[in-house]
Amino acid sequence: MSRETKSNTSKTAHDTLAKKSRDEGVISGGHLVAKALKTEGVDTIFTLCGGHIIDIYDGCIDEGIRIVDVRHEQTAAHAADGYARQTGKLGCVVTTAGPGCTNAVTGVATAFRSESPILHIGGQSSLTQHKQGSLQDLSLIHI
């Protein structure tokens, strides 16, 4: 890569967002989530990468929160539980919408029964597409 190309490369996810936006003061909801996680002392999230939650990853990178990407959401939930039990810190599992959230239920239930401090953040389809059969649209609050 040439020096010229390197100098034009974004250094952070915030830089990338700023380039996409006409208003550099705009911040995504995912970045706000990451800032809130950092404020609460979260230093690691367990996840399976998904499109609905990509802005959270960008925010976590900017905030210095470690992202542990696993192969299944149930693994992410169990890992967050194990992390909480071993460290005494809040374990955080981040899943994409629909099946991503439902796949984590067993791990979240295990943590609940064991009184492990974990937080499950689930993605959601766009509100403009809510209840219109969009990809992975599922009401998750009741689950």
Walk through the language-model features, giving the residues of each.
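N-terminal alpha/beta PP-like core and its mobile active-site loop of ThDP/TPP-dependent enzymes
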Residues: 2-141
